[in-house]
Amino acid sequence: METKAILRGVRLSAQKGRLVADLVRGKSVDQALNILAFSPKKGAKIIRKVVESAIANAEHNDGADIDALKVKTIYVEEGTTLKRFTARAKGRGNRILKPTCHVFVTVGE
């Protein structure tokens, strides 16, 4: 039995999100939450919420035992990039790119 949780449009680059996702892939959910709680990265807080949501989904929808759950798959994909403009000297302008990503978590026994 596998249960999913998805978070779309997170204001985080996919590259930075993947660094955090690699830390918890394949771990038990208890161990994964512990790693994410003490990680100083911005992506850790975001991914922790998605893992907690997947755990809640497994408990509520499937009646799963929380202690037996593991993070089966976790991956981060690129989302749309927000394009912004900032004024520069001599009437010029530069683009500012604000990347987003989608986080997918699957937990199971």
UniProtKB/Swiss-Prot annotation:
Domain of life: Bacteria
Pfam family, any one: Ribosomal_L22
GO molecular function: rRNA binding; structural constituent of ribosome
The keyword Signal appears for this protein: no
InterPro entries for the chain: Ribosomal_uL22 (IPR001063), Ribosomal_uL22_bac/chlpt-type (IPR005727), Ribosomal_uL22_bac/org-type (IPR047867), Ribosomal_uL22_CS (IPR018260), Ribosomal_uL22_sf (IPR036394)
Matching CDD domains: Ribosomal_L22
BP term (GO), one: translation
UniProt KW keywords: Ribonucleoprotein, Ribosomal protein, RNA-binding, rRNA-binding
Subunit structure: Part of the 50S ribosomal subunit.
Its biological purpose: This protein binds specifically to 23S rRNA; its binding is stimulated by other ribosomal proteins, e.g. L4, L17, and L20. It is important during the early stages of 50S assembly. It makes multiple contacts with different domains of the 23S rRNA in the assembled 50S subunit and ribosome. The globular domain of the protein is located near the polypeptide exit tunnel on the outside of the subunit, while an extended beta-hairpin is found that lines the wall of the exit tunnel in the center of the 70S ribosome.
NCBIfam families from the UniProt entry: rplV_bact
Similarity-based family: Belongs to the universal ribosomal protein uL22 family.
Official protein name in the record: Large ribosomal subunit protein uL22
Organism of this sequence: Azoarcus sp. (strain BH72)
Gene that this sequence comes from: rplV
